[in-house]
Amino acid sequence: MMLKKALVCGAGGFIGSHLVSRLKRYGYWVRGADLKYPEFSKTTADDFRILDFRELSNCEKALEIGSGEKFDEVFQLAADMGGMGFIHSAECEIMRNSALTNINMIHASSKNDVSRYFFSSSACVYRDMNPEESELNEDDAYPAQPDNEYGWEKLYAERIAMAYGRRFNIPIRIARFQNCYGPEGTWEGGREKAPAAICRKVAEASNGGTIDVWGDGTAMRAFTYIDDMLDGIIMLVHSDLENGVNIGRQEYVSVDELVKIVIEVAGKNIQIKHIEGPVGVKARNFTNERIKNLGWESKISLKEGLSRTYSWIKSQVEKKSS
């Protein structure tokens, strides 16, 4: 029996590296490709290529495989991205680098007869909303009103993937991720997202100390643990769901509540100091009915996921300071 072959673009990143491991567990032959190897663990990919997807020729190299063979599934997760601070400070870089990557990869895939193509989009394609509003469904991405350029680029990339899918008869599967977190994600340097940044600050703070939090702490968010997100990706790819599909845990908390959960799992007594900084939208709540109809559900509570993530980040902080 021939093994299914998968190409994971962005396999050096957080979700991509975890996805490689999950696909290997399912018996795939996996090639990973990215600008860098995974930072915290050795890749489990059968083959790994260091490639810059802003060049079309590199996308073609990623798709090179034996004569008469092709990739059954291409997972496009490569992107120039980070937390809210990075998104607001690097708009041009995000739009240029990610747009080139997405244009080139879907174009190369269309020329290489791939059987199925997955694109990782984001809840950032949706507009700002008030916490008391009804949850957004997938159709509410239009009329388009993303609040930042990262969201606009994601929406454009969705459309170009779907256009190529129609022209070349490629099944396209698109996930709109809610915030994803977990061990082995970026936790320092400016590109880390809120859960990792907060875990780092709490780990570094002395008991009885204070940590800085951007904004007034009232912005509402939902966060999805990496294992749950991977379940959703696999289910979506093997389904017949077209267009963007929301994947995310519907456990909404304010930023201050998020901080307090991390402080609790750390077993510390720490005060919050609000400071000026980019905070993004007030809220972005969406419905998960389409992915839930496939049998998906989030199994890891926010507290449990943050406990696992905090333990890992604490070990990284201790390792760096030793």
Where are these regions (language model features)?
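Conserved catalytic-site region of short-chain dehydrogenase/reductase
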Residues: M84, F119-E135, E149-L155, R167, ...
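C-terminal substrate-binding subdomain of Rossmann-fold SDR/epimerase-dehydratase oxidoreductases
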Residues: E204-S322
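Conserved Rossmann-fold NAD(P)-dependent oxidoreductase catalytic core, especially the SDR/UDP-sugar
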Residues: I103-D147
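N-terminal Rossmann NAD(P)H-binding glycine-rich loop of SDR-like oxidoreductase domains
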Residues: A6-Y26
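Flexible, glycine-rich beta-alpha linker
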Residues: Y126-R127, E149, R173-A194, M220
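NAD(P)H-binding glycine-rich loop region in Rossmannoid oxidoreductase-like domains
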Residues: F53-A99, K111, M129
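Rossmann-fold cofactor-recognition segment
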Residues: T44-L56
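Active-site Tyr-X1-5-Lys
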Residues: Q145-R173, A197-N207
